[in-house]
Structures are given as structure tokens and as C-alpha cells.
């Protein structure tokens, strides 16, 4: 894992979180308790702070990049950023899910429990309401979320963290077994947890 100080700022990573040895963390980054950062993720807090809330999961190949001082990234609690998602700034409230390959531009705000579907783009400055599902380039609302949908998102995020904790307890050197998501899935299929 590459952890680099930048401009006098060093990443702060909770001891209760897992950061893959194949990820890169640079500058003003705060990773709170029970966060999981998967392989290939690049988190660059060079120009503004990146703060990742408790129980959030950052999957393989996610890019978090602050391009200017006006583009901090705040990721709330129980958020899921799926493979290949890119955030160039923005504020994500709790229980947000950004799906595979989506692009979030600077100065956006994404409300509690919102879901941005695969390969969508959230344009600069857009305020996404709470509990909506959005899709497209640029995104449009395709449906509302119920309170139950939001609670299911919270459970899904919590599940990823708990699953990793169980695996880590079973394997003292779990990091070497979890270098890639496909290896992780193969392991899960072989073990009953």
C-alpha cells in the first residue's frame, strides 16, 4: 500500500479499518472506523480533504480525487462506492450508493439513501435529493426510495464490514488472500462463514 504525505498532510487511517496493500492514499485523507478500501483504489487528498465515514466500503479501482480547494470529498457513514466509480469532489450523506463506473463531479451534494446507477454522471454543483435512484448522463431521477430501501442499503454496507471482520479473524494474514475481488469471492465460496 502506498501512503504518502503531501503538502504537510499525512493520511489518518483508523486501526479498525482495512486498507488493501494494493491501494494508494495521498495527503489530507481521513479514514474512519470500520471502513474497507479494496485493491486498486486511489484516494488523493492533495488539494482538499477526503473524509470517509464509518462502515463505508470503497471497492476495487475507485478513484477519489480533490482537484481544487473547492472540491473536498465527504463520504458519509454506510456508503458503498462500487468498482470503478470516480468522485472529483462532493458531499455524500449517509447510506449513499454509487454504482459501478459512475462519475461524480465537483461541488455536488448527494442526499441520504440516494443511489446513482451504473455508468451515470452527476454534473458539477448538482444537489441530489435524499432517497432517490438516478441514472444517465447527466443523471435523472428514475424512482423514489422507501425508508426500507435505505435501511437495506445500511445493512448491505454493514454486511461488507462484518464479513471482512469474520474473514480476518479466520485468517491471521487475510491481506494476502484478499488482493483482488475475484480472489475474495473464490474464498467466500469455499468457506462457510
Residue ranges and their predicted role:
Residues 1-30, 34, 42, 192-193:
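Extended, small-residue-rich solenoid/repeat segments and analogous flexible loops
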Residues 1-12, 46, 52-54, 60-62, ...:
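Glycine-rich hexapeptide-repeat left-handed beta-helix
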Amino acid at each position: 500500500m502506498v501512503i504518502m504525505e503531501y503538502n504537510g498532510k499525512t493520511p489518518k487511517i483508523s486501526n479498525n479499518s482495512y486498507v488493501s496493500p494494493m491501494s494508494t492514499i495521498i495527503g489530507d485523507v481521513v479514514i474512519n472506523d470500520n471502513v474497507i478500501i479494496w485493491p486498486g483504489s486511489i484516494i488523493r487528498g492533495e488539494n482538499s480533504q477526503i473524509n470517509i465515514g464509518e462502515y463505508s466500503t470503497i471497492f476495487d479501482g475507485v478513484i477519489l480525487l480533490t482537484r481544487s480547494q473547492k472540491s473536498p470529498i465527504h463520504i458519509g457513514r454506510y456508503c458503498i462506492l462500487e468498482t470503478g466509480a470516480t468522485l472529483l469532489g462532493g458531499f455524500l450523506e449517509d447510506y449513499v450508493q454509487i454504482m459501478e463506473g459512475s462519475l461524480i463531479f465537483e461541488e455536488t451534494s448527494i442526499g441520504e439513501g440516494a443511489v446513482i446507477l451504473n455508468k451515470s454522471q452527476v454534473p458539477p454543483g448538482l444537489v441530489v435529493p435524499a432517497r432517490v435512484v438516478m441514472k444517465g448522463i447527466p443523471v435523472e431521477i428514475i424512482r423514489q426510495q422507501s425508508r426500507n430501501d435505505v435501511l437495506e442499503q445500511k445493512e448491505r454496507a454493514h454486511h461488507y464490514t462484518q464479513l471482512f471482520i469474520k474473514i480476518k479473524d479466520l485468517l491471521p494474514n487475510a491481506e494476502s488472500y484478499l488482493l483482488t475481488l475475484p480472489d475474495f469471492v473464490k474464498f467466500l465460496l469455499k468457506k462457510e462463514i
